[in-house]
Each structure stands twice: as C-alpha cells, then as structure tokens.
Amino acid sequence: MNRREFDKLLARDKHCLHCGRVDDTLIPQHRANRGFGGAGRKSTLNNASNLIVFCAEANELIESDAGWADRARFFGWKLSRWADPSTTPVYDLPNMIYCILGDDYSRVELHNFGKGYLTNENRESF
C-alpha cells in the first residue's frame, strides 16, 4: 500500500476502528489475510473493502491473542476466507456503528444494524 492509498483509507476511517486513536501509530489492517485463508484471494487482498485503519497496538493484539482475534471476527475486523469484505459489515467501535466498506474507499453507515447492542456503558468491555 502506498502513501496515497493509505491517505484515502485514513480519509474514510478517520481513526483506529478499535480505540479511536488518530496518532502516528495508525496502520492498514487486512480484514481477510493470508493467515485467515486470504492467500487464494490475492486479487482482492488489497481492495479497499478488505482494509481498515487500526493502531499498531490493536493490530498486534488481534494478530497474537486468541481472545482479541475472536473479538476481531465478531466485529468484522477479521474475516474468514469465505466472507466477502464488500458485503460484510465492520464495526466502528468509537462511533458505535456498523458500516459497509466499498472498494472505492466509500463507507455506508448501517444505522439500524445491531442498534442497541453496544452502549457507552458496556463498550468498555470490548
């Protein structure tokens, strides 16, 4: 991913989708990757719908900790080889909203999808 592509990703996501950070630790995170069976989908591996912004700390946790990996799959931050990133919602935890991500760096917020599941009171457990 080059700087221009990462800038488009940052313009779409605006912050780490887990913690809301907006500092220089932000990196691109593949939702489906080689470790989750994404190698057979090389043509779509770097599509914008398969990329989200995470801070380096959250990225390390979901790549190395089983509990965090489960959480990442629950929120659509990580996907199995069978999931289509362009149709699988991803959760923006700081804004408490699910979104569909397009391959053109678009983002459609799903205002009624999962509504009420997370509130300010219980989101800290995630």
Residue locations for each model-derived region?
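Short edge-strand/loop segments of extracellular domains
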Residues: 36, 73-81
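Short Cys/His-centered divalent metal-binding micro-motifs
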Residues: 24, 45-74
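Short cysteine-rich loop/turn motifs with clustered Cys
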Residues: 2-29, 53-58
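Short, charged surface segments at domain edges that flank catalytic/cofactor-binding sites
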Residues: 1-15, 38-49, 90
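Short recognition patches in nucleic-acid-associated and regulatory proteins
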Residues: 25-40
